[in-house]
UniProtKB/Swiss-Prot annotation:
Listed GO MF terms: RNA binding
Biased composition (Gly residues): 610-633
Name of protein: Polyadenylate-binding protein, cytoplasmic and nuclear
Composition skew (Low complexity), residue ranges: 36-46, 634-648
Keyword vocabulary terms for this entry: Cytoplasm, mRNA processing, mRNA transport, Nucleus, Repeat, RNA-binding, Translation regulation, Transport
Gene3D superfamilies: 3.30.70.330, c-terminal domain of poly(a) binding protein (1.10.1900.10)
Record organism: Aspergillus clavatus (strain ATCC 1007 / CBS 513.65 / DSM 816 / NCTC 3887 / NRRL 1 / QM 1276 / 107)
Region (Disordered): 1-52, 365-420, 595-648, 729-754
InterPro entries xrefs: Nucleotide-bd_a/b_plait_sf (IPR012677), PABP-dom (IPR036053), PABP_1234 (IPR006515), PABP_HYD_C (IPR002004), PABP_RRM1 (IPR034364), RBD_domain_sf (IPR035979), RRM2_I_PABPs (IPR045305), RRM_dom (IPR000504)
Annotated PABC domain residues: 649-726
Biased composition (Polar residues): 1-25
Length: 754
């Protein structure tokens, strides 16, 4: 992740004092002697050119103020920067401290290294900006098999006797515990060789340590591949627990000289069923693998193979899992269906019965909670339980009095099934059905999607992986945001082309958008400026269009832009092709509000040259005079004003619906449904519309597209309403549409109970 970094002084100024400079880097500079990169720093003779220190191993809560309080005790601090993540602004655990002179930096490195800050010892070293010097492995020493009690300071004190240390670090896990290995970066290669010569094989805290030159990961990988090809250590599992160490060694001695053989045992001394054998030559190990793999020893078939390290096994298992996952995904591509909106009483068998007619089902599963659902007890259910208990007591007495034969196997199986069903958790309302072929799956989607099952319409679609669903969701959210922006622009009172301000284009330049332009009237035309519209070079219309200097307005045969359909021609014709001051807002008002849309002059906009007062309808039109009714000009009779036409009910799309706010979605659906329902039931159209609006928005969109389904829903709502009226009586007519809705809910509840 990206981070902000304050770097070291770059160069000396005239007075010889280095200047602190700031820069940005994408990651923490690896100046530590770590496994992934092996930095090098110049010797002390070159250090006066830099007075910047790297401070690592910091607690995430450490701030610049805390560091300033500590490092200012040494000398005057030029700047301090704690490096943070560019997005979350959380500390990355390291910082840079820039002093005004190098002597203060040297004193801070000597006195403050491994000082406790917020309970954690900090690690200080000279900062090195040159990555080429940081990543050379010269002088870097690797130490393993360290005792857990050895920390950075103890390691530094141990190896400081062999030369000047630039960096020293013990690797730790996420909990701060030592991983048992570390790195010491010396100033010179001679010091590193001296440390390896004297410390390798010695005891540190009663543990024999290995000390050697650090090998980069790339070189280690090539060496590791060579070791894999010439292995001598083999792993054996599925060993019979009765096999002893002597028997185990004797089984594998026939293939060559064994340097070591061991059986793994638990703390109680019992065999854990696996062991290791190490041969002196690769040929012997390979022969043992070839001969003993899958061979039975004391009725146990052995597994014999090359011994692997833990990280190697984990990587291999990860690859196997990924390959199996991809194979499974390709195998079930187009045949696995996702079904939701299931009622609680639908189980695996019921789901299989529903989709069985469409093909061969390989699996059907209803997803359930991990724990059984607790039934809510009502007074009625408590009474039923008491009655059931009394009946059970009577039955037990009768069974005790009469000797009955043992239950048959079938009865036991039935009871087992019932007990299993009781242990099942509550249904999550969705499941999966897998067919044997894609054709059967597509047929099931076509037939079963939106089908009513137990009073609820099913949603059936092809199952998708989580990452695919996430990408589709992100795309839909982005499209929804785009629609919202377009609707907000339309609400400002301008067609889309005029929503974009005028853009200036210099020779060979992309142009700029003037700041402060809000929705409404466009900029007055100026030389070198064209009106902004989508497509090609933004804001350019083909041919002379209003807004170009010296133009005469729109020609009589010129095609109008898409969003100008419905605007009176007089509103776009005036001297110089400039939209008239009053005609243009009135035309916009007619487009948005239909009759009476004329709004007059925009408040606060002065009447400039080329703009006319009320009633002006283009070049040569009358000025002044009474305005006709409805706010239209005198040309309105000759040219019918294109008011906003009623959109057909079926024009409502899911994309437009999702772009609206949740409270407005039901209103939009109601406005689209009402005309269709009114055509079928003029008297009860309002009540039926209100009843249908209780359904999900996706189902309502489906009804708008399917007249047969809508007719069936209207008939169903009528039957519910008629039943409600019969129960209430003709004299108690409902006062509003809420009562039939309640009746519909009561009827649905009774149907579910039955």
């Amino acid at each position: 992740m990206s981070a902000e970094v304050s770097t070291t002084p770059a160069a000396d100024n005239v007075n010889g004092t280095p200047e602190a400079t700031n820069a940005a880097a994408t990651s923490a500079p690896e100046v530590t002697a770590v496994e992934s990169s092996s930095p090098t720093s110049p010797n002390n003779n070159n250090q006066p050119h830099s007075a910047s220190l790297y401070v690592g191993e910091l607690d995430p809560s450490v701030t610049e103020a805390m560091l300033y309080e500590l490092f200012s005790s040494i000398g005057q601090v030029a700047s301090i920067r704690v490096c943070r993540d560019a997005v979350t602004r959380r500390s990355l655990g390291y910082a840079y401290v820039n002093y005004n002179n190098t002597a203060d930096g040297e004193r801070a490195l000597e006195d403050l290294n491994y000082t406790l800050i917020k309970g954690k010892p900090c690690r200080i070293m000279w900062s090195q900006r040159d990555p080429a010097l940081r990543k050379t492995g010269q002088g870097n020493v690797f130490i393993k098999n360290l005792d857990s009690a050895i920390d950075n300071k103890a390691l530094h004190d141990t190896f400081a006797a062999f030369g000047n240390i630039l960096s020293c670090k013990v690797a730790q896990d996420e909990f701060g515990n030592s991983k048992g290995y570390g790195f010491v970066h010396y100033e010179t290669a001679e010091a590193a060789n001296n440390a390896i010569k004297h410390v390798n094989g010695m005891l540190l805290n009663d543990k024999k340590v290995f000390v050697g030159h650090h090998i980069s990961k790339k070189d280690r990988q090539s060496k590791f591949d060579e070791m894999k090809a010439n292995f001598t250590n083999i792993y054996i599992k599925n060993i019979d627990p009765d096999v002893t160490e002597e028997e185990f060694r004797k089984i594998f001695e026939q293939f060559g000289e064994i340097t070591s053989a061991t059986l793994s045992r638990d703390p109680e001394g019992k065999s854990r069923g696996f062991g290791f054998v190490n041969y002196s030559t690769h040929e012997s190990a390979q022969a043992a693998v070839d001969e003993m793999h899958d061979k039975e020893v004391k009725t146990q078939k052995l597994y014999v193979g090359r011994a692997q390290k833990k990280h190697e096994r984990e990587e291999e298992l990860r690859k196997q899992y990924e390959a199996a996952r991809l194979e499974k995904a390709s195998k079930y591509q187009g045949v696995n269906l996702y079904v939701k909106n299931l009622t609680d009483d639908v189980d695996d068998e019921k789901l299989r019965e529903l989709f069985g007619p469409y093909g061969t089902i390989t699996s059907a599963k209803v997803m359930r909670d991990s724990t059984p659902a607790e039934r809510t007890e009502t007074p009625d259910s408590e009474k039923e339980k008491e009655v059931n208990k009394e009946n059970e007591k009577k039955e037990d007495e009768e069974k005790a009095a009469e000797e009955k034969p043992k239950e048959s196997d079938e009865e036991k199986k039935d009871e087992t099934k019932k007990s299993d069903k009781k242990l099942l958790g509550k249904s999550k309302g969705f499941g999966f059905v897998c067919f044997s072929s894609p054709d059967e799956a597509s047929k099931a989607v076509t037939e079963m999607n939106q089908r009513m099952v137990n009073g609820k319409p099913l949603y059936v679609a092809l199952a998708q992986r989580k990452d695919v669903r996430r990408s589709q969701l992100e795309a839909s959210i982005q499209a929804r945001n785009t629609i919202r922006q377009q609707q907000a622009a339309a609400a400002a009172g301008m067609p889309q082309p005029y929503m974009q301000p005028a853009v200036f284009y210099g020779p060979g330049q992309q142009g700029f958008i003037p700041a402060g332009q809000r929705g409404g009237m466009p900029f007055a035309p100026q030389p070198g400026m064209v009106m902004g519209i989508p497509g090609g070079r933004p804001g350019q219309y083909p041919g002379p269009f209003p807004g170009q200097q010296g133009g005469r307005g729109m020609g009589p045969n010129q095609q109008m832009p898409p969003n100008f359909q419905g605007i009176p021609m007089g509103a776009m014709q005036g001297p110089g092709g400039i939209p008239n001051g009053m005609g243009y807002p009135q035309a916009m008002g007619q487009v948005q509000f239909g009759r009476g849309g004329g709004r007059g002059q925009v408040p606060g906009m002065p009447m400039g040259q080329g703009m006319r007062g009320p009633g002006y309808q283009g070049r040569g039109g009358p000025q002044g005079g009474p305005r006709p009714q409805g706010g239209r000009g005198q040309n309105a009779a000759a040219q019918p004003a294109a008011g906003r036409e009623e959109a057909p009910a079926g024009a409502l799309t899911a994309q437009a619906l999702n772009a609206a706010a949740p409270p407005q979605q039901k209103q939009m659906l109601g406005e689209a449904l009402y005309p269709k329902i009114q055509a079928q039931q003029p008297e009860l159209a309002g009540k039926i519309t209100g009843m249908l609006l209780e359904m999900d928005n996706t189902e309502l969109l489906g009804l708008l597209e399917d007249d047969d389904a809508l007719r069936a829903k209207v008939d169903e709502a009528l039957s519910v309403y008629d039943e409600y009226m019969k129960n209430k009586g003709e004299g108690e007519a409902p006062a509003d549409a809420d009562k039939p809705k309640e009746a519909a809910k009561e009827t649905a509840t009774e149907e579910n109970k039955s």
